[in-house]
Amino acid sequence: MTIPDPANIIHNDAGTASPHHIWADVGDSTSSSQHEATRSRSDDANGGASASMHAPQHVKANRAAQPTYDSSDLPSFGLSARLTRDSSSFGSKPSSSASDSRRPKFAPYEAENLWATSSTTSHPSKASQSTLSPNASVFKPSRSLQPNHFEPHAVANVHDFDDPLNSAYSSDTVSPRPDHAPLDHEQPQQPSALDPVAVSKVEEQRGDHSIPHQNGLVSAQAQTASDAVSTSKYTTEAADQEEDQDDFVYPGADSPSSGQAAVQDEQQAVTDSQTTKSLTKQESDPEASSTSLSAPAEAEHIVVGSAAEQSLTSSAPAETAVHIDYDTLAQLCSRGPLSDLQSFFHTAQESGLSMFSLSNDPNPGNGLVPLHFAAKDGKTDIVRWLITQAGAIVEMEDREGETALHKAAMAGKLSVASLLLSHGADANAQDADGWTALHNACSRGYLDLVRLLVDRGHAQIDVQGGRGAWTPLMNAASKGHLPVVRHLTAKYHADPFVRNAAGETAFDVAAATFEVYICEILERYEAERWNASKFTTSSPSRSGAIVPGRGPYEPLALHTTIPVILHENQRLDTRLQTLALNGGKPRWSSSSAARAHKPDRRSPSSMPPGPLAPSRTRHVPMRQDDVGLPTRSLPYKLRLRSRVGPAAARRRAAALAAQHTPNPQDCHDDDLASTPTPESVLQARRGTSSVNGASAQHADAESSHFWLCEWQLDTTHPLVDVEHGWQYAQSFDALDDKWSSQPPPPLERLLEGRGLSASVTRAITGGAGFANAQAEQEISSSSWVRRRRWIRVLRRRLDIEFGDDLEACEGATGAGAEHLVLSSESQSNGDGSHGLSTAAIMAAQEAAKSECSQLGPDADYVSRAKALAGPSAASGATPADAMGADRDELARRIARLVMANTELRAAFEDDDVERRSRAEELRKEYALQLGQLREAAGLDEDEDEDAADDDDDEFIYPNSYKDDGASVFTRLVNGETSGTLSRPSLSQRQSSAASMLRNSVAPSEAGTSLAAARSADLAANREFRVPTNEAPNKVVLRHGPTMREQNLQPQWQRDEEAKDCIGCGRHFTFFLRKHHCRRCGRIFCDACSSKRAQLRMAELVVDPSLPSMAASEVLAPTRVCNGCHAELQLPPQLQNMRGADAMMAASRSRGADEVSGRSILETQLEDGAFRSTLAPPSDVSSRASELTECPVCSTTLSALGGSEEQEAHVRNCLENGGGGSMQGGRYLVYKLPEDSPIVGKECSICMEDFVANSTIARLPCLCYFHRGCIDSWFKRGRECPVHARDW
């Protein structure tokens, strides 16, 4: 009967073929070449391909040189030939055990190996029944047991080789170690499976005396095969799961199953020896082949069981593997010395561990290798030995993905970083979060490491790392490392406009951490980059991207977080009076900083020049309260209130009056300008309405930013005192590098009271006793100033869309036209000496561009600059010949020189040294000619004169607010020149007109296009209306001021809304009180509202919370502001109606509007005279002006009878006190009723409110005071505290 092949029954070779396409020739005999054509079944399962075709050449040679028979003169089979992993074409992983055994990673056929070991009997032993055998780890094909595989004629192919995935871990292979004497922990050689004595002894040890019958072999095999299939699935899944969990074991790490693997390897050697001898004997006796098929299986089964039992006794000696003390290794690498570390490595090497495995073995606690420990602690000799001798990998990463270079850069180890770079470390390697070594060095401020990484390691400067996409410049700026920031910007030209994931630049992150001085450095660097990138063709890549050179540099448009800086200025006061009061020592004084006779006088609080300041060339007086947040309508401009001195205000008011007055004879002198007149009120009325409207608009405007902090001292500047923030110098005009953080020795002597003889002598003699230069030098040495910086940081609101991509590109016009195109209003109002012809400028630009285009595209920037300048600016020429030319010629030459200077800016990026030198010389020559031409045109003189006026007059003097602010001119000019309410200057008006058209006009190479500038001129002309395609208006509009809808009823201004006096601009304090004008309802100081006027009930404006206040205010003259008092002096038909009169006039105007279709409220200015179409106001209704109760006793007047009786009662109460008593005929004293209209009003003496049932004194002038206050007052005089009148 033919025995069925179990391989064909339960195994499908084609379906379960290895993905590596490598199969082992399990029955490969190399005895004869006559059976070479016969292939093993393993080759058939592989589609006829032999595994040897994939073998390396050295494996093929070894296989060809192997002997046909072994030492026992028996054929050698592939089952007994083991191929180590070192010889495999797949490579190998270093093992942690001395026996070099590892748990298999590829074992898809364990089940058939199990079937082969358990097929000898239907009643397997307990050892093979309880669980999988330790040796059943890899499938050994079952067809190795078939007769055709054991025929002596089976010939192996010379190209065959053992599969490393099977043979290396097969339980039927021998140990790869060469023949040698048994080691101490090895078991002695097991007896052969065919030795009956040995077999019987083994069976007796097992306790199993049943011998399987031969004829039951096939049935037992078939029965066991089905169980093996299901078991193989479980075993395969378990092996795959273990492979996922332990995919890679670092070299040198102890495996938990290392002892078991060593035992398995020894048992495999014993089992293979027994099986080989049994199979050899069976082949040598063909007649007994039919009766001894079960012999090998039995022998193998017996040996497996005995090996399992022997594992208990052999496991103890196998667990003597080398244990690595990782803590000691880390300490030796971190602290050394090198000799101890070398001894540690030699000891481990003698125990079976290689130096390569130990040097690259990570610490199980933190994942660091020895190279990481040595690098972060700066052990250069250990790092060098680990790399060159121990074989440490330079690019080995830890759990965070950091290399040794990351560790050295973070710790600042320069020598280690240099050594790593010399051995091939990558300076641009990123860790798991994207940080590079340059990020680490910049974050810690190691300038030497930054230079090393960039110069030698070629690290990328603008690389973005981390989850926030930060650049190295951002890391250095946010941590305040000034030297690194300077080096990255000055030498390596880092891009300051790169944004991180939050849309912030390096400037923003520095401002957010209050590194203000670094913000100043970055601001200057950004401005230089911005100006150097003008007129480029780059376009924004995405919304919100920064395009340098597009328009003016505006920090508020480019950044989200910006600091505002103010200077507190003081001067050393060495006057004789101060020395006498201060014990002979000088003192610092803020008021002395603004002395008029000092050439470097400075306001006590000023804003330095910059992009955010009103001026870019000089310090502007500015208090902390004067700085406001930008509004949503103007998000890129700070709201700043500029302070103007009284003298400058009067001069500017006179100049403004001269512009509006056609004849100079009608102008008033400066001394009369301080007194309000009806004419001044009429001239300023239009300006008052516009200023008030703008003030209300900005007061209610929503801010686009918010403050991150309050005002605080800045100590980030390297030249300031770290404790108090002061800087010391001998003049406020000293350069920044001339200031010192500590008082110099001469200043210290002065502060101690020494070296003041010159100051005292000068004070006594008036300066007449100084004749030599030494005395003058001594006097100058006593002049010292100091300042400190106050900062406040504002940040953009996140809930507002700004559209930076459009706003930043708003000013896309050239800088040349911005300096040249002047408002046509100044040309029309003046004599033509304050501006140049725009038409001439535009014509010159067109001609210059035409000449430049003829040079062709290959011309360099020097040639183009010469062509733009024209022949009039040839080398050696001077503009002296243009002094007598007309202004159009001057405008043309100036325009061409500006274009030439703009073209020469390309020299900043030119690498040609010679050409850059010629461009620099040419630029200096053109700048000289341009200055002379501008001087000839009279452009610089006006600007210098304005600057001189501002320097002389625009200062704040403490306790110097002596001007009563009565001048309407002064008040209105103050309002126009304060903050955002000021009328823009000439250049600002030009810029505003140009910015309205910039979005629709493409930028030109040399400046603003001709159409844009012409449109700006036309838009500035009041008489010009741009024609459109819409239908023409049927109604001809009048020429005159545009009327705006406004509330005709004056409103009572709340106290919390007023911080400064509207008249003089002084800040309200405890000593400077607030006063309401009863006619306009606005708040003024006492000096600006000292006038009294008798108002009608319809004109009164009272507090809405105290409606009964009108009854007391109408009886006597009440407080009005100086402007309302001046307006009341006008004829009735020219006065502005207030209160009820205005409401009734509005009602009449609406009725007239229905009839005539024209508003009766329209006004106009013709020939300089004001004419109003308002009708004379009618008398106030008696019902509205009647008193309902007595103001003294609060008696209802309607119950007293007619008007005569009411007037008599009020007169009697006023004269006799209405139940009160007149103290000595001077004032009336009475108890204040609860319903009195003056309850809640303020006593002018103690500033406390009147309370019901308190004792009140009323003077004959109807002024009310507390009884105790007026008694104390009259002890010092006999004048009313309000009216200063004797009683």
UniProtKB/Swiss-Prot annotation:
Residues reported to bind Zn(2+) 2: C1077, C1080, C1121, C1124
Binding sites annotated in the UniProt record for Zn(2+) 1: C1061, C1064, C1085, C1088
Acidic residues compositional bias, start-end: 938-955
Keywords: ANK repeat, Cytoplasm, Cytoskeleton, Endosome, Metal-binding, mRNA transport, Repeat, Transferase, Transport, Ubl conjugation pathway, Zinc, Zinc-finger
PANTHER family cross-referenced by the UniProt entry: ANKYRIN REPEAT DOMAIN-CONTAINING PROTEIN 39 (PTHR24171:SF9), ANKYRIN REPEAT DOMAIN-CONTAINING PROTEIN 39-RELATED (PTHR24171)
Record's subcellular location: Cytoplasm, Cytoskeleton; Endosome
Compositionally biased tracts (Low complexity): 86-99, 981-995
Motif PAM2L 1 mapped to chain: 239-253
Motif PAM2 per UniProt: ranges: 128-144
Zinc finger annotations (RING-type) as residue ranges: 1243-1283
Residue numbers spanned by region Disordered: 1-298, 582-630, 643-697, 934-960, 977-1005
Outcome of gene disruption: Causes defects in hyphal growth and secretion of chitinase CTS1, 2 cellular processes that are regulated by RRM4-mediated endosomal mRNA transport.
GO BP, sorted A to Z: mRNA transport
Family: Belongs to the UPA1 PAM2 domain-binding protein family.
Classification via InterPro entries: Ankyrin_rpt, Ankyrin_rpt-contain_sf, Znf_FYVE, Znf_FYVE-rel, Znf_FYVE_PHD, Znf_RING, Znf_RING/FYVE/PHD
Basic and acidic residues biased stretches: 177-187, 201-211
Short sequence motif named PAM2L 2, residue ranges: 941-960
Assembly description: Part of large ribonucleoprotein complexes (mRNPs) containing RNA-binding proteins RRM4 and PAB1, endosome-binding protein UPA1, core scaffold protein UPA2 and associated factor GRP1. Interacts (via PAM2 motif) with PAB1 (via PABC domain). Interacts (via PAM2L motifs) with RRM4.
Summary of the function given for this chain in its UniProt record: FYVE zinc finger domain protein that functions in endosomal targeting and transport of mRNAs, as well as associated ribosomes. The endosomal mRNA transport regulates polarity of the infectious hyphae by transporting a broad spectrum of cargo mRNAs from the nucleus to cell poles. Involved in chitinase CTS1 secretion. Dispensable for general endosomal functions but crucial for endosomal recruitment of RRM4.
Protein name per its UniProtKB record: FYVE zinc finger domain protein UPA1
FYVE-type zinc-finger residues: 1055-1129
Residue ranges with Polar residues bias: 115-136, 212-235, 255-294, 674-695
Record note on domains: The FYVE domain is sufficient for endosome interaction.
Source organism of the structure: Mycosarcoma maydis
ANK repeats by residue range: 366-395, 400-429, 433-463, 468-497
UniProt key word Cell inner membrane: no
